[in-house]
Every structure is written in structure tokens, then in C-alpha cells.
Amino acid sequence: MDPFHEGGNAGGVDLRKAGEAIMGAMKAVNPNAVWVVQAWGACPYPAMIKHLNNGDMLVLDLYSENRPQWGDPESTWYRKEGFNGHDWAFCMLLNFGGNVGMFGKLQHVVDEYYKARQSKFVSTMKGVGLTMEGIENNPIMYELVSELPWRENKFGWQEWLNSYVEARYGNINNTKVHDAWMLLARSVYGASDKVLEQGCHESVLCARPALDVYQVSSWSEMEEFYNPDDVIRAAQLMVEASHEVKANANFRYDLIDITRQAIAEQARYVYDEIVAAYKAKDRKMFDYTTKRFLDILLQQDRMLSSMPDFMVGGWIRSARNLGTNAQESDHYEWNARVQITTWGNRNAAEKGGLREYAHKEWNGVLADFYYPRWKAYFEALAATFDGKPMKQLDFYAMDEKWTLLHNVYPYEAQGNPVEFAQTAFENVFGK
């Protein structure tokens, strides 16, 4: 229970009495009840919890890896008294909106955890937690945090990474795989404590078209903290290794995910070329690069059709299956489609700034939602080369059409992921 979470108004409320009333109501039902509360922003207010009995509350420090509240004096959300003697858990948030993309702070997460372990607040630290808004991404980071309580002494990510790769794939003894993960650990998973972006490095393929595209969701605070070429090289090594090793389920998933990230990086390079060509009034280069961008987008869509984890079909099917009749199923499908695109009506999407908050780089969405947007935008730009005014596109109207559809998407793999990744990498990078 989280009173005043994200914008609740505590004005005129006696916080001490409110906290005691909530706890009293819980104890009346179950004398052994423990109040689990999220630490986010200014909540839980110290005045609400400091008079409650220790042992009756467990505080989840939601964002321990970025803005810890357990009492770290270096945190922007520093609480001098921590959680006022209440039990708490060191939690990693990592992902906002369930966005698809690789991101993490391997060493920083380790450093922060052991900093807490060595602080005066360790006596009330009861464990770790995973508090991501969306799971099914970046398994390496969840594995790392889950392993922390079992290691008494601080360690470096290099020694841990080797054991992680062996545990994940089996004793494959392939240097290309290990080298690929070293590149990833130093790039997308090597964000420092200074990097405050909320969630993954977002794919330009999912962005609303413009000549100044940077991030996709309005809340991402995305930063350029790594060399995209390291990700592309890591994907190349994984693709090469896929010809040499016996691919278990984990390897197949990672091969698709790493190749997906590399293709997204390449798409951003091509996007920059499009902008440069347009500003230089180079029609030939503009036509070439826009076609290449759209081809890359469709190639990404096709590759992801080989892995159910990256297919919108399963998402929509799960939503429809919740309905007890056709009308309910249609409504749940609409909700599922809206949640990963517009987030709501025009007001929520445009004025609320939450469109694409939970965007997904998935098969089906790429081809049917993102491709038409980019194609229409490029066609509008192309027309200006002939002296025509720039057409004002109503992107929300385009987006809404997709949310109202009920076309059926496949939810089972449409091909061999190893072969699809190999083909995609060759088509995009020519290697």
C-alpha cells in the first residue's frame, strides 16, 4: 500500500495518524501483517512511518541502483535516517515501460549493493528485490542482482561474467561468445553511476518520425554513453559463433536480442545519413538512405518473428484470452494495443506525453505500426524536394487506426532463430 505515491496530495493530512490508522486496519485483520511499501520520490513520508513499530514494515527501495533512499549520502534522493529503522530491500528498477532494449550498470549495481552492506543501515537490510516495470528483458542484470545476497565479498563484473556465460550456455568453450559479452559489458551494460537514463537505449525504428529524433519515449532521459560499434561487433561475434556452437534456448534468445540491438544501432546511423542528405538537398542520397532505413525496419520485423518473446501475437492473444465473451476480448485487445503505443486517447498521447512510454520493438508492431509512419513521413519529406510544402501528418490518427484493429498475429516462431539472425545480420551489415 503506497499512500501519496506519485503526486498524491498530503496537504491537511496528519501523517502520523494516517500511518497508524493504516497499520491498525491491517493488524485488525491479521495481527502478523507486514506493511510493504515502495520508496519512490518523497514517499513513504518519514512522518508517516517513523512512529510505527520496527518489524511491522518492509520498504522496497525501488531505485537502489540509481537513486537509493536507504541512506546513501551521495544519492539525489538521500534520506539521512534511511527508513527510520524499518526493514528494507535493495531493489533494482532498471526497466521502465517494459521497453525492448539492452541496458545495465553491471559494476555500479555491485558497488551500490556492497556500499549498503557496509553501511550502518545493513542491520535492517533484509535482501534484494527486482522492481522493474516490465520484465522479459536484460536477463543478465536480473541474474546479477539475484546472486548478490549469496556472495559475502564484493566482486568485479569481469570474473562474474565468465561464470554467467558458462552457466547460461553450458560449457561451450567458444572465445567469440566470451568476447561478445565482454564488448557488451563494456558498452550497453557498462553504464556508470553518472548515467541516469530511465531504462534501455531506445530504437530509432520505434520513434515518431522527425528530423531531430533522439529518444522514443518522452521519459527516457536517454544518454550516449557507449560506442554503438561495440554492440555491432558483439552481434557479429555471436552470429559467427552460431555456426560453431550448439545453440540452447538461452543462446538463441541472446543471439536474437543482441542482433536486434545491433540492427537498431545501425538504423540510427542510417537515420543520421537521412537527415544529412535532406539538409544538403541531396535527393539521390535521400532516396537511397530512406529506402535502406525502411528495409532495415522490415528486416528487423522478420528476424523477430523467429522468437515468440519478440512477437506482438502472444501479447494480444494473452489479452484476448482474458475475456469471457467476444466483446470483452475485443476490449482487452484494444487495451493491449493501446498500452504499447498511444497509452490512451489523443489527450493522453499528445498532451500527457505518455505515447510510446511502453513501446515495443516487436514483430508485427514494427511492420504494421512503425513502418507506415516512417514511410508516410519520408514521402512527405520527398515531396518538398519538388517545391511542395511539407505535409502536416496527424500521427495520432495513424496510430489510433492500428489500436482499433483486430487482425490476428502469429504467436509461434515463424522460423529458425539462428538462421533468421544469420540472414538478418548479413542483409543489414553485408557480413
Task: Cite the ranges covered by each PLM segment.
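N-terminal non-cleavable signal-anchor helices
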Residues: 205-206, 214-217, 240, 246, ...
